[in-house]
Design a protein with these regions (language model features):
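Secondary-structure boundary elements
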Residues: 86-90, 150-156, 189-194
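Mg2+/Mn2+-dependent nuclease catalytic core
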Residues: 164-187
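Surface-exposed cleft-lining segments at the edges of enzyme active sites
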Residues: 65-66, 130-136, 164-171
């Protein structure tokens, strides 16, 4: 293991330790400080008539869990960005030219996925978007991106939609893939031809257990297995 690898490993440990410690202290302090505030975070989450009949302890417990889940997700997103910055240039938006034909081609591909005319999806399905448009009717489009990463050493580009929970959203699988493909097309239009661009749909943990395959069929209807992290 090289010194550079060891240094990076220690840096990651330091980021994780600092992030978790800061989160725990801040989470405890914020909720204890707001306990008597009727407009505090927990007190604004307890007004559920169905939970209320179970008693005040259950009311506060469920509110605390909901607040923890939301706050933890925000912390993990920030921590992931800080870790990514050790190796990648990190951006959170993609903007550039997109042709009407590319937009239509993306829509047609998604329809084929929906009707299962193409199954299973593969990363080869959308490589035609690498062809730069020759038409003049280009529009500038901008997408917010969870993580647009550029490898500082290789120049490879990675577009990642990250879900902090263990469940990739079945209902939004199509719209997530559409946004990623449009970003893929924009980068293809603006970067040199041989630039590597990869697309991923990721989650912080696997609801089926780490190392086990995804079984969410709606997600796999639109995403290739090697696009799921």
């Amino acid at each position: 293991m090289t010194n550079n690898t060891l240094d990076k490993k220690e840096a990651i440990k330091s980021i994780v330790h600092a992030s978790v410690e800061s989160f725990a202290v801040g989470f405890q302090g914020r909720h204890e400080g707001e306990l008597e505030d009727p407009e505090g975070t927990l007190n604004m989450k307890i007004h559920n008539v169905f939970i209320a009949v179970l008693g005040p302890e259950i009311q506060y417990y469920t509110a605390l869990v909901r607040s923890l889940d939301s706050s933890l997700g925000n912390m993990l997103e920030k921590m992931a960005i800080n870790i990514a910055k050790l190796t990648y240039e990190v951006k959170q938006s993609v903007a550039g030219p997109l042709s009407l034909k590319q937009t239509q081609d993306v829509a047609e591909l998604l329809e084929k996925y929906k009707r299962r005319e193409i199954t299973p999806p593969t990363t080869e399905d959308y490589q035609f978007l690498r062809t730069k448009p020759t038409e003049q009717s280009l529009v500038t489009k901008r997408h917010d991106s969870d993580y647009y990463l550029i490898d500082k050493e290789t120049g490879e580009n990675f577009l990642i939609e990250l879900k902090i929970g263990g469940d990739l959203d079945n209902k939004k699988a199509r719209s997530e893939k559409e946004a990623l493909l449009e970003q893929f097309a924009i980068l293809s239009n603006t970067l040199p031809d041989k630039t590597k661009i990869k697309v991923f749909f990721a989650t912080a943990y696997n609801r089926f257990g780490e190392g086990k395959p995804w079984r969410q069929e709606r997600v796999r209807q639109f995403f290739a297995d090697d696009e799921l992290l």
